[in-house]
Amino acid sequence: MPPLLKLALELGPLLVFFFANARGEMLIERFPILGSIGAPIFLATALFMAATVIALAISWSMTRTLPIMPLVSGIVVLVFGALTLWLHNDTFIKMKPTIVNTLFGGILLGGLFFGKSLLGYVFDSAFRLDAEGWRKLTLRWGLFFIFLAIVNEIVWRNFSTDTWVSFKVWGIMPITIVFTLLQMPLIQKHSLTDEENTAS
């Protein structure tokens, strides 16, 4: 899959979520039937769920596989989105990033506790690292996911819904990109050569 399309499929649902929340009242005025869903955050949640399903469907149709992280995130979006709409309580969709990041962080750190660098099983086809490299990278990403979970809790519990939505779209992604780039020296240091790949 082309990298730009992959990025679009990952960012698309988030942009739909942001736009629907920011322009929800305008959309409801133009399409009154949408008013039955409720406040803009509930409309945004419904469209976020739909966009997530569409993105996963496109990814599956092109590759016949679904990456584990987008798949798990998508399932949580649908479950917590459904709870948000059913109970008419936006707490559930706000807690979704906390649940997903805690889950990923817990799995990675738990794997390390049992001597398994699980990140290697996910990205081994993308690049090859030695055992120490995978261990360090798994530890860093595990702690980073826990950090994101804590930050999400702080933001949604202490700021307005609009601020939380903006941070979710325009804050988390840049932070993640910067963190990813900061891992490049580690990846380069522990990358296996072609000879080492063949030997392994």
Swiss-Prot record:
Q: Which UniProt keywords apply?
A: Cell inner membrane, Cell membrane, Membrane, Transmembrane, Transmembrane helix
The question of whether Isomerase is a record keyword is answered with no
Q: How does it sit in the membrane?
A: Multi-pass membrane protein
Membrane-spanning ranges: 1-21, 37-57, 66-86, 103-123, 136-156, 167-187
Q: List the disulfide bonds.
A: none
Q: Where does this one sit in the cell? A: Cell inner membrane
Q: Which coarse location class applies to the principal site listed for this UniProt protein?
A: membrane
Does the keyword field hold Transmembrane? yes
List the Pfam families. IspA (PF04279)
Tree of life domain: Bacteria
One GO CC term, this protein: plasma membrane
Its biological purpose: Plays a role in cell envelope biogenesis, maintenance of cell envelope integrity and membrane homeostasis.
Q: Check the record and name the NCBIfam families matching this protein.
A: ispZ (TIGR00997), PRK00259.1-1 (NF001323)
Regarding protein family, the annotation reads: Belongs to the YciB family.
HAMAP family assigned to the protein according to its UniProt record, in alphabetical order: YciB (MF_00189)
Q: What is this protein called?
A: Inner membrane-spanning protein YciB
Say which species the protein is native to.
Answer: Brucella suis biovar 1 (strain 1330)
